[in-house]
Swiss-Prot record:
The lineage of its organism: Eukaryota, Viridiplantae, Streptophyta, Embryophyta, Tracheophyta. One of its GO terms (molecular function) is protein homodimerization activity. It is found in: Nucleus. It comes from Oryza sativa subsp. japonica. This is LOB domain-containing protein CRL1. Keywords: Developmental protein, Nucleus. Can form homodimers. The keyword Nucleus applies. Belongs to the LOB domain-containing protein family.
Length: 259
């Protein structure tokens, strides 16, 4: 009995009097038990279910009543497979979700790999672009020479400067000192030429000045050529593979010849 003389859901569906010790009373309430027991009675039969519950221990009866009720409702939806069809559908759903999870993991790993490769490729492109820019500006050979000689001077320093010990600033100072020495030598040559013309008693001042200037220019050109030849031998002994030294010498010779 469910209390106050009300029958249980099974007895209500069977339209019988619910007696004390009814095997269905603890598991089928008066309000909703009738609908649940209707499926059980249609699939298994009330007498078969009562015998099954009576043979089970009291501790196992609640779980058995729930299982029987679920199986009866599944059999009404699928008379052939019952709850097996629902279990199979759940297994298929689990397999589909596992395949999707594996695909997402593989895609994530591939994306990380492509990101690392892209970063490495980008760094290589930037390095190649920087090297190409250095070669275009004339810094490539200088950087290679500094690396082979242990020099740490940056590429932004004078690309055409040379020195015997690998320093860019020292080479620039050597060229500056050489040009200054040539200028001083030309001035001294002009001074001695004019003294010589005055001592010789030249009558025509214009011709004397021209002759003195020509002699001084020729003397200074010879002196500058000797100086450049000496420095060229030093530069060629210290760094034998540079075309910029010859370019600088040709520029200096052109300047002296025009003067």
């Amino acid at each position: 009995m469910t209390g106050f003389g009300s029958p249980c859901g099974a007895c209500k569906f069977l339209r019988r009097k619910c007696v004390r010790g009814c095997v269905f009373a603890p598991y089928f309430c008066h309000e909703q038990g009738a609908a649940h027991f209707a499926a059980i009675h249609k699939v298994f039969g009330a007498s078969n279910v009562s015998k099954l519950l009576a043979h089970l221990p009291l501790a196992d009866r609640p779980e058995a009543a729930v299982t029987i009720s679920y199986e009866a409702q599944a059999r009404l939806r699928d008379p052939i497979y019952g709850c097996v069809a629902h279990i199979f559908a759940l297994q298929q759903q689990v397999m589909t979700l596992q395949a999707q999870l594996a695909s997402l993991k593989a895609a994530a790993a591939q994306g990380i790999h492509h990101q690392d490769v892209g970063a490495t490729t980008k760094g290589g492109y930037m390095s190649a672009a920087a090297t190409a820019a250095d070669d275009q500006l004339g810094y490539g050979g200088y950087n290679q020479w500094c690396g082979s000689n242990g020099g740490g001077a940056p590429a932004a320093s004078q690309p055409g400067a040379y020195s015997s010990n690998g320093g860019a600033g020292h080479g620039h100072d050597s060229i500056t000192a050489l040009l200054a020495a040539g200028s001083d030598y030309m001035q001294h040559s002009l001074y001695h030429a004019f003294e010589h013309s005055e001592g010789a008693g030249a009558v025509d001042d214009g011709h004397a000045a021209a002759a003195a200037f020509e002699a001084a220019a020729e003397s200074s050109s010879c002196g500058m050529a000797a100086s450049f030849a000496a420095d060229e031998s030093v530069w060629r002994s210290s760094s034998s593979g540079y075309q910029d030294c010859e370019d600088l010498q040709s520029v200096a010779y052109a300047y002296l010849n025009r003067s």
